[in-house]
Structure formats: structure tokens, C-alpha cells
């Protein structure tokens, strides 16, 4: 995926987190369940999954953009797929999914935020709750996706169009992953999609392209210790996070990163 992010770059900034300017009043828990996800969209009309105050912190959980069935087709062991992932896919009806494919946790309604404000989102910590991710190689890179003689058939996941998807084990102690024989990359987890609801007149927007609401920027610099500033377009901001990546280069050259589940703590401040 190659995104036109000119608008996003003009309206969002990534900087190193500085000293706290608003002491957190409370730490909230936001797991990923059928009742706490926005499946494939950012939308001003979405029902909040959580309501917080400016300065509050949220311990949040997000799911990778692939199904338990897809992961098993790639070779993941059934016992390595958390039960809550199966419950999520069983619990969200098809008519509540889309138009995009990202399963985002939220929305988070921030009291006091309204159109014209700026929402400061601090990435305080980001961790890897499972020891694997996957890569779906496709698009114009498809001819490089497979080993010689490998058709890629039946390997499932998002790597369609003649590509291939595969499980990538991760060493969480060393924070590395071997992505190919002899090629090891450092793990620097981040959320590929962080955004707020767009203006109400935009309706329910696809989670795939980033825009004025931020969203699917796939910015590998948004690791723990950084801060994102996003313009607010609707009451409460309606913040969503997802599309967790364990590692990524400068863009998703083969269409994905090392996609995985993430847990982390964020802090939200209205400016």
C-alpha cells in the first residue's frame, strides 16, 4: 500500500514526548471485544467504546488485521491464537464490518474535545503480547514473494493477487525477527492506524487511506515515547487505534509490515 499522505502531514505532527502537562486522573482498560471495535471505519456517528477525561491514560489492546482462520492457513498453531480473537470474529456481524479491513479498537470519547481542538496522543508504552506476526506479500512485489516452485496457494491471509502470506516468529527477549534466512530485523512496535473521527459530513470513511483525521498513516516513527497531535473534527474526538506492527520499513513495500497484536498505554490530552 502506498498512501498519499500530503494532507495528513500538513495536519499531524510526530514529536518526542516531553514533560507531562496534564496529570492523569485515571487509568482505563480497553480490551478488544465485539463491543469495543470499529471494523474498517472512522465515523463521527460511531458509538463510543470508552469515555475518558483529558489527561487520562488508557491501557489498550489491538488485534492484527487477519482472522484466526487466515492465521491457521499460514501455519499458526490453534493454541497460539488467543480465544478472544476467535470470539471477536464470531461476535461482529458481517453487516457491521467495513468498508475497510482494519479492526480498530475504540472509539474513545474524550470529554472536552470538540471541532477546532487538537488531540495530543502520547504513546507511553507498546508491547508484544504474542510471539509471532505475519506478513502478507502482494501487489507489485508479488514476483518476489515466494521461493522458487512455491505457488503460494492455500496460504491465506491478505496476501492475495498471486502473493503469499506467512507467519513470522518473533524473539521478544532480543526484540528481533528473522524475516528471511540470515536476515534479522529489530522489532519496534507501533500502531499503523491512529486517528479520530472525520467531519460528520464525510460519513463513515474507509480505514485504508489516511486523511485529515490521520488514520492509517503506517508511520514507523510512532513508537513508545513519541506523541501524535491530531486535529479534532467532532465532539469527543472519537479516537481509534489498530493495525499493530512489530516492525516496518519506510512504508509497506510488500503491502504489509510484520502484522501482530499489540498492547500499550496511551495518554490523551485536549489542546
Question: Where are the regions a protein language model picked out?
Answer:
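Bacterial N-terminal signal peptides
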Residues: 6-18
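Sec/Tat signal peptide C-region and signal peptidase I cleavage site
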Residues: 19-24
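Short, basic/aromatic beta-hairpin or loop at an interaction surface
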Residues: 25-38, 79-99, 194-208
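A generic structural signal for residues embedded in beta-strands
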Residues: 60, 118-121, 230
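Short, Lys/Arg- and Gly-enriched loop/turn segments at beta-strand edges
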Residues: 65-77, 126-137, 236-246
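Intrinsically disordered, low-complexity linker/loop segments enriched in Gly/Pro
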Residues: 99-103, 109, 124-223
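Conserved mixed alpha/beta catalytic, RNA-binding, or beta-rich assembly cores of soluble enzyme
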Residues: 189-216, 220-271
